[in-house]
Amino acid sequence: MEKSTMSAILLVLHLFVLLLQYSEVHSLATTSNHDFSYLRFAYDATDLELEGSYDYVIVGGGTSGCPLAATLSEKYKVLVLERGSLPTAYPNVLTADGFVYNLQQEDDGKTPVERFVSEDGIDNVRGRVLGGTSMINAGVYARANTSIYSASGVDWDMDLVNKTYEWVEDTIVFKPNYQPWQSVTGTAFLEAGVDPNHGFSLDHEAGTRITGSTFDNKGTRHAADELLNKGNSNNLRVGVHASVEKIIFSNAPGLTATGVIYRDSNGTPHRAFVRSKGEVIVSAGTIGTPQLLLLSGVGPESYLSSLNIPVVLSHPYVGQFLHDNPRNFINILPPNPIEPTIVTVLGISNDFYQCSFSSLPFTTPPFSFFPSTSYPLPNSTFAHFASKVAGPLSYGSLTLKSSSNVRVSPNVKFNYYSNPTDLSHCVSGMKKIGELLSTDALKPYKVEDLPGIEGFNILGIPLPKDQTDDAAFETFCRESVASYWHYHGGCLVGKVLDGDFRVTGIDALRVVDGSTFPYTPASHPQGFYLMLGRYVGIKILQERSASDLKILDSLKSAASLVL
C-alpha cells in the first residue's frame, strides 16, 4: 500500500478516536457573543470618587484579578483598578483573527498589547486591557500539571481546585472545531512517538491531545473579563485607565496595607481605602506586581535606599527569581496554501511542550513573534512549529527603570538558557521537531521529495541536518530563542508570600497572579491563573466566615456569663 494512502487512513483513524473521546470532559461553555454585561458597573477612573472605601481593593483586572473580584463580591464591596482600557475600545482583541493583528499594532501607550524588550534583547509583550493577557493570548486552555501542587508551598484543597476549574470552564472554555492543519499536526505528533493519544482533554498529561480554547467555534474570544458577570453587581465596581502608583501603609498596630493611590487618565490622584478586615490584593501580573511593591517601599533594603525610595519593609526577594519559558521554532512554507488555524493540538513530554499553528502571510512583523525585526517575513501561508522548555530553571530579576513613575515599564532580565538543563531540554525538543518533520503526515507539505527533515521550504533559521549534533542544536536554540509570553515569578510563595498568598510581614496585603510561582503550571498557564483567582477568593470568604463565627461565639459566651 502506498505510504500516502496509509497516512490518510491513519489520519482518519486518529480523528475518529479524538472525536470519540470528546464526551469525557464535563459540559463546557457554548458559543455566544462576548458578554459585556459587566459594563453597567465599569467606569473610567475619571468618573470614580477622589476618595472611597471598600472591603477589598484589587490592583489589576487581569487573568486572576477578574475571577477574584467576582468571587469576593458575593459578600463584600470590591473595587478593581485596571490600568488599561475596556476591550470594547479595541474590537480586534475579541477575535481569533485579531491575535496576530494585536501584535502588529503599534504601541501608542494605550493599545491592549504593551511592548517591552528584556535586557536579554528579546522582544516581549504584556496585557494592557481589562481581562489582561487572557484578552491578547492565543486562547489555549489547559489545567495545571498535577505535580505542581505538591511542590508549590500551598496546602491546596484539591476538591475545591477542581470545582474552581469547572466554574471557569462552564463560562469561557470551548471544545475547538475541527481544523485540518491541527489534525495533521496531531497525526504527526503520534507518528513521532508523542504517545499516548488522549483525544480531547483539559488535563496536562504526557502525550498528544486536543486541548480547550477560549475562542468559541465562531472565533469569538472569551476571557477573564466575562467572569466579572458572575459577581454581585451591587458590590462590584471596576475602574479602567486607573494606574495604581503606590500602596498606602499604616504602622498601627502592626504594618498594615490600608489602601492605594492611583491616577486617572487626566493625571488626577485618587485614594481607595480598605475597611476593617479588608485587604489590598495585587493582581498586576509578573511585571506589574513586583514593580508596584518596589515603588511602595517593599523590597531589598539596600536597593530601595539607593533609589531614595523610603523602605517600608525589607523584602530581599521581591523582583527576584523571574522566569520566562523560551520558545524555539521552525517555520515551513508549504507548496500550496493552508487554512489559518489557532492552536488546539498539543504534544507534551516531561521536558518540553509543543504545538503548531498556521497563518496567512503578513507584511508587518508581529512584535515578539520572531526573535528580531530583521527576521524574514512569509510571502505565503506558513506553519509554525514551536517548542517550549518546561520549567524553566534559568531565572533573572526585575529592577525599576523609574523610581517614581509606575507607567514606565521596569527592566527585566530572564537569562534564557543560563541553566544547562534548560538548554538540554531545548535540544531534546527541537530534535523532536525534527522527528515531526520526518513523518509521513508532513510529506505533502514539502516542496521537494527528499528524506528526513529535508525538502521543506524553511522560513528563517533551519534545523541542523545532523540530528546527533548536540552542539549544533545548542547553537540553534540560542540563536532562535524567542519568548513564549509565559513569564512568571518575582513574588514567590515561600520567598515573599506565605502559603495563603499573604505578603509576609504585612497585614491585609496579598498577591494573586503569575508572579507567585517559579514555574509555568502547564502547557499554557492561563487556566491555572483563572482558577487561582477564584480559588483564593473562596478561601478568603471561608476565612472571613470562620472569623465571624468565632466572634459570634465569643459574644454568645460573654452574654451567657452576664446572664
Swiss-Prot record:
SUPFAM superfamilies: FAD-linked reductases, C-terminal domain, FAD/NAD(P)-binding domain. GO terms for molecular function: flavin adenine dinucleotide binding; mandelonitrile lyase activity; oxidoreductase activity, acting on CH-OH group of donors. Residues 1-27 form the signal peptide. Its EC number is 4.1.2.10. Glycans are attached at N145, N162, N379. Substrate binds at C355, Y484. Coiled coil: none annotated. Disulfide bonds join C426-C477. Keywords: Disulfide bond, FAD, Flavoprotein, Glycoprotein, Lyase, Signal, Vacuole. Glycosylated. Its cofactor is FAD. Its main location: other. The keyword Flavoprotein applies. The active site is at H486 (proton donor), H524 (proton acceptor). InterPro entries: FAD/NAD-bd_sf, GMC_Oxidoreductase-Related, GMC_OxRdtase, GMC_OxRdtase_N, GMC_OxRtase_C. GO terms for cellular component: aleurone grain; vacuole. It is an enzyme of class 4 (lyase). FAD binds at residues 63-64, 82-83, 129, 133, 137-140, 244, 485-486, 514, 525-526. Belongs to the GMC oxidoreductase family. Involved in cyanogenesis, the release of HCN from injured tissues. Catalyzes the stereospecific addition of HCN to a variety of aldehydes in vitro. It is a major seed constituent, and could have the additional role of a storage form for reduced nitrogen. Monomer. This is (R)-mandelonitrile lyase 1. It comes from Prunus serotina. The gene is MDL1.
